[in-house]
Swiss-Prot record:
Lineage of origin: Eukaryota, Viridiplantae, Streptophyta, Embryophyta, Tracheophyta
UniProt protein name: Histone deacetylase HDT1
Presence of the UniProt keyword Zinc in the record: yes
InterPro entries to which the protein is assigned, alphabetical: NPL (IPR041232), Znf_C2H2_type (IPR013087)
A molecular function (GO) term: hydrolase activity
PROSITE patterns named in the record: ZINC_FINGER_C2H2_1 (PS00028), ZINC_FINGER_C2H2_2 (PS50157)
Stimuli inducing this protein: By fertilization.
Amino acid sequence: MEFWGAEVKSGEPLTVQPGDGMVLHLSQASLGELKKDKSESVCLSVNIDGKKLVLGTLNSEKVPQQQFDLVFDRDFELSHNLKSGSVYFFGYKATNPFEEEEDDEDDYDESDEDIPLTLANSGKPEPKEAGKSNAGKDSASGKQKVRIVEPTKDDEDESSDDDDSDMGEDEDDSDDSEEETPKKAEPAKRRKADSATKTPVTDKKAKLTTPQKTDGKKGGGHVATPHPSKQASKTPKSAGSHHCKPCNRSFGSEGALDSHSKAKHSAGK
């Protein structure tokens, strides 16, 4: 930023040049000393691009100075209609921000233009070439697939061996299943054997219970079911036992009693 000021005399317009890449900010205008007709109004003008515009009006008694907020980025000319005297203009110079923005926009536009070119050159090939390349890729991929699918002799041998082993395993499994099937019939045989063994037991029970019922009818009271072994042991006693009174022992036959008495009692006599 640079301070700027200029004096514009009566009848002498002043041409102002902001400079390359610079702008001029017009901030203020004020009247100088007036020697004659102090109540006279002074009209301030600017001429830019061949057009003359009024900036404002000054009066030494009422409006001796006036503030502006005008920015010029090109050459312009200042003037006034004061007959005798001078008007002073003030402001400052600075770099042109609009020009920098325009440069940035130009650079941005150029970068935008470059992007499609690079994409067209690298990312988007011509349709014919794309078709050819795709056809080449498809043919190459097809060849690769054919090579992958074709089995070698070793693979065929291995696959046949695997099939034979699988068939052998299946046959072994089937043989095992056939051998195991007769085992399932064993429970039926066992049931038949059990039923055959159980049937005579029922007959024995029937034989044992029949005399009990006849005894029950004779007694007319509660008949206890005797154990078969106990009945068998009691039957020889009921048939007739031979007792030895001195010893208080019983024998099954007379011969046994005689031999006992001869051995024990005759020896004592």
